[in-house]
Regions:
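Generic preference for hydrophobic/aromatic residues in regular secondary structure cores
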Residues: 14, 141-144, 150, 176, ...
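Low-complexity, glycine/alanine/valine/leucine- and proline-rich hydrophobic stretches
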Residues: 148-204
Length: 254
């Protein structure tokens, strides 16, 4: 039996070879055989990333995607033992290394973030919402779906085909991603800043229509503000971004 420290040394050598392709002889291991093992592991990594980033995989040229995933696999030491979190580390790798493709594809960071957040929201633990009813209750606060994230983006990766996005599209964009509890589907909602303010307020506690209206009145006359807020609420109830109205006590739904 080999000493424990020797075994660990060989394990590190094997792990380093799997990442970099630089082979250090390991007793009892043939390089041609371990090469197949490395390819198998890399294919699993690449497959996981392609599954998480279908839009990014589609917009990059095949050789660009191969080079990106190979460089990530070779030079980045993943911190999480959970495979589903690996795509987050690819996003962070591109962000932190100022990866060269970001010059050719200025929207790349936003696209990676958008696709990763879809995975993250899908995989997040269940969050118990504030007690609510779908019945209409006068003056009751609206209840936000707690399984949500709101992103601030520079490019409209949620609105346009990535291949059609140019530097002229750069601006300020907001999008929310939420999970529908019945189906587990991830739905996204394009937003403007007043919508984001509404979501931020509802994230703290249920708030009624008249209180939320104060936000919209900062941007539009009263009639226009009322109509815009009501339209947003109706659409959000339909998509389950909003779940209903808060139940304060049992008499609220009688």
């Amino acid at each position: 039996m080999q000493p424990k420290n020797t075994t660990h040394k060989h394990q590190r050598s094997l792990a380093n070879y799997c990442r970099t392709g630089e082979y250090t002889p390991i007793p009892g291991v043939k390089e041609k055989n371990v090469g197949r093992y490395r390819q198998l592991i890399f294919n699993n990594v690449k497959g996981s990333l392609e599954s998480a980033y279908p839009l990014t995989h589609n917009v990059l040229a095949q050789e660009e995607w191969e080079e990106l995933t190979q460089e990530f696999f070779s030079s980045h030491k993943c911190q999480s033992p959970m495979v589903w979190q690996m795509p987050k580390e690819l996003y962070e790798y591109v962000l932190e290394t100022n990866y060269k493709l970001a010059d050719k594809y200025p929207f790349l960071i936003d696209l990676l973030l958008f696709e990763w957040k879809e995975v993250e929201v899908y995989m997040m633990e269940d969050i118990e919402p504030y007690p609510f009813t779908e019945k209409r209750i006068n003056d009751a606060g609206l209840v936000l779906n707690p399984e949500i994230q709101v992103l601030s983006l520079e490019y409209p990766v949620h609105l346009k085909n990535a291949k059609d996005i140019t530097k002229k599209d750069k601006g300020h964009y907001f999008v929310s991603l939420h999970r529908e509890s019945e189906t587990g589907r991830i739905l996204f909602t394009n937003m403007h800043y007043p919508h984001v303010q509404v979501i931020e307020k509802l994230a703290q506690e249920p708030v009624n229509f008249e209180e939320l209206l104060k936000i919209f009145l900062q941007y539009a006359p009263e009639q226009e503000a009322r109509e815009a807020l009501q339209q947003f609420i109706n659409a959000s109830l339909n998509s389950k971004l909003l779940l209903g109205q808060a139940i304060i006590n049992s008499s609220s739904i009688n």
